[in-house]
Regions:
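ER/Golgi luminal nucleotide-sugar-dependent glycosyltransferases, focusing on the catalytic module
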Residues: 1-155
């Protein structure tokens, strides 16, 4: 499979594995009876450069937030999947992406791209989606970084 964003060939497993992991998180979350303002889904290799606590950003309970990334496609038909934050219902919709793959791809015509699939899962909330730019001095990814192989990079 070719990923247009990175211009690389990626395996289907690279998309399906995280979607299945999120499905399992959703299975656990559905059973949880605790009431929280926000639930956060994040990759294990992501960090951010900010001395500000997330709640100091004035997050609204009915909004959906994700990590900032520069580009015209984001929040139009893609969601950056490094860090995602929302109420239980929104996070459960994301966690349900794996179970809805056939519908999303075959019936709805969404490409096998987790950025597009996540946006499609939450499209009804488009007007309440925001990207969280934790450090505007980093223009590409707003202070969000990958931590891999002993290096820290924005992409």
């Amino acid at each position: 499979m070719f990923c247009w964003k990175s211009k690389k060939q990626i395996s289907i497993t690279s998309t399906l594995s995280p979607l299945y992991s999120m499905k399992r998180v959703g299975d656990i979350l559905v059973e949880d009876t605790e009431d929280y303002d926000f639930f956060i889904l994040t990759r294990t290799d992501i960090g951010c450069n900010s001395n500000t606590k997330f709640l100091e950003f004035g997050l609204k309970k009915d909004h959906f937030y994700n990590s900032y990334v520069r580009g015209n496609e984001w929040l139009v038909d893609h969601i950056c999947a490094k860090w995602m934050c929302g109420n239980k219902d929104k996070i459960l919709k994301l966690c349900g992406t794996y179970e809805n793959l056939e519908k999303y791809i075959v019936e709805d015509g969404i490409a096998l791209c987790h950025h597009r699939l996540f946006f499609h899962a939450l499209k009804e909330y488009k007007d309440s989606m925001e990207m969280l730019n934790v450090d505007p001095s980093y223009s590409l990814a707003g202070g969000w970084f990958f931590m891999r192989n002993g290096r820290i990079t924005e992409s």
